[in-house]
Amino acid sequence: MNTHEFQAKQILRKYGIPVPDFYIASSSKEVEEIIKQYQLQSAIIKVQVHAGGRGKAGGVKLATNPQEILEFSQELIGKKIINEQTGPSGMISHQVLISPAILIKKEFYLGITINRELASRVLIASPIGGVNIEKIAHEQPNQLLMLPIPLEETFRSYHLIRIASFMGWKGKQIQEGVAIIQSLVKAFKETDASLLEINPLVETKEGHLLALDAKLSIDDNALFKHEDLKTLFDPSQMSNNEARAQQFELAYVALEGEIGCMVNGAGLAMATMDLIQYHGGRPANFLDVGGGASQVKVAEGFRIILSDSNVKAILINIFGGIMNCETLASGIIEAAKGLQIHIPLIVRMEGTNVEKGKQLLQQSGLKILITENLTEAAQQAVQLAQSVR
């Protein structure tokens, strides 16, 4: 689950990490009240969307007087941000973050994520901040320090000295930086985060360290432990299909192709998409219905796929391990009849009760093409999608 910048900053503040003052507004009236109450003369105004690259997309403004604060806020409330991270449909900012402008001397980067190769939480630090960390890793790898976080969830003194030296901190900055690192590790663990970053962490003109921007992503599988964090979820940052998919516990990602995919298992879904691409087609989505999908889930998966007008064919690829092929076939039939599907439907299934499942499909009276293997299924899906055009 992604969060907004202001929510991530609230979490950082809770753990004692210094962040600048900020205010949230979703209307012109609220902006006017903030300007008056806090006597703002200059401010940074930022859109609040679940994506980075907001500045380049026109979503960050520097206002040098109260009138500009109001005008820029009005411009950004309701603004649609479109970039690589939002996808072509973009994301709408329903509120803005207003923060008094401050003078800074230097920018740093601090973040924690999961490194699956090391099977460990990893701290990432760089004396260069305010830019995409992947860009630093690619262009200036010597400016990046990665340290696995020990099992005891705290760094030893020599680790902290190494980080402070690498970042170029001196004097009181060392003490402040060490405290921020320790609090960041604690916050990451206690929120069950998958990503927590401060970018940039800045040195103010007074020489103090301050978290100027923050990003927090929480592991969806751990949300059952965090009723308080569940309230941070903002459904407006998802498409209607993504929100529906989450409601029915379907893993769904919209793409830009013409072949809808319904698969059980993330690995099998990726392989299915690769084969479609290999044979000259383009997947319209990633949709994993999970190992124990019910007829209701299958039907909802169909509804989500069919809501995309670009879809010209649907490929269903199921391995009946946990899922029974007979149950799946019943779900397909019920959904297809109820939704009146008028585009080619290709089904490839293997596993438990596969013959009974195929028999049900064959006797359904529906125009369903049953294939024997995945390669044939992908080829047929591509050919039929092209014929619909």
Curated annotation (Swiss-Prot):
One example of a Gene Ontology biological process annotation: succinyl-CoA metabolic process
Chain sites annotated for binding ATP: 46, 53-55, 102, 107
One Pfam family, short name: ATP-grasp_2
Superkingdom, natural source: Bacteria
EC number: 6.2.1.5
Record keywords, A-Z: ATP-binding, Ligase, Magnesium, Metal-binding, Nucleotide-binding, Tricarboxylic acid cycle
HAMAP family registered for this protein in UniProt: Succ_CoA_beta
Protein name, per record: Succinate--CoA ligase [ADP-forming] subunit beta
Gene: sucC
